[in-house]
Amino acid sequence: MPPEGAAGPLGAARRGPTTPQFHPLRIRDVRPETADAVTVSFEIPPELRDAYRFTQGQFVTLKTHIDGEETRRSYSICVGTTDYDRDGELRIGIKRVRGGRFSNFAFDTLKPGHTIDVMTPDGRFFTHLNAEHGKQYVAFSGGSGITPVLAIIKTTLELEPRSTFTLIYGNRSVDAIMFAEELEDLKNRYMNRFVLYHVLSDDLQDVELFNGVLDQAKCAAFLDALVPADSIDEAFICGPAPMMDAAEAALKAAGVPQEKVHVERFGTPLPQAGVPAVEITDATPAADLEIVLDGKKRKLRLPYEGVSLLDVGLRAGLALPYACKGGVCCTCRAKVLEGEVRMERNYTLEEREVKDGFVLTCQCHPVSDKVVVSYDER
């Protein structure tokens, strides 16, 4: 999702704590990227350097109070792992969203010197790297979806000197391209190993293939003309939902195996940031619930309907990890050790993970009379 302390692949998990934890971090820098996008970097104290060690493609979750209500939002890290190893730089990309509660707060409020709660890195949008690999990677990205993809590209090109990377990046116009200069610098630095194609919907370009939107037909055209599907070892997709669906469908139709395709969906948190005010009485039909967190066990009652496993734990005062509450970010992932649950939504867990007992607790309701779930097995 390192060279330091890693036995095996360079992409092996680099994080310290099993369960993500919040720490107050001071903002080092706020840098404009486009008219509606900025990057924010944080100062990492020496004692937290290991805790915030990340894998390319991961994200952090920010937490603050807006109008008296706790609000969380996850943002992808946009620097390479080697950047962090060299100078401790932890930087995220934030794009202003119309009506977006947290993004507008970030634009209007976050300044150098301010402090905000930041969760340790999480996420699984990565592949394991190895200096001996000579792979061909491709990424389809759109808008702010470039944020984790940039970290993946930078890290891969530096740690796998025999691998190549092709990026197909869609935007409305030249002015809307995030990290435009940084991408050009990478293109110049790795002239024989990094290929960059910009696809613009509003600004006309000389080559017709580079005009329009990244729908399935456009993605398929790139695979036919410039990036042969049988040459792709691994593919990454991140951006607006229609673009991601289109790229995924095009890769599948071209014969790229599903296990070679990595997809990162940016989820919008559900409107309610707090815990639902569902009354749980002795008469409420509920299962027996046992939650394991940091080696400690807590027994609760989990109603069969109306409230999720995560919210029952939060209501009991447990510091359970979560971010989007929409079944997208995977921050609330845990493992069912006993019993059976059902999930309302699942946009991120793979089929094999579900078979192994992993669940998104923000989407979980009990099926059996007893459920034991562990956040220590993530």
What are these regions (language model features)?
Residues 1-21, 26, 36, 253, ...:
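Iron-sulfur (Fe-S) cluster-binding modules
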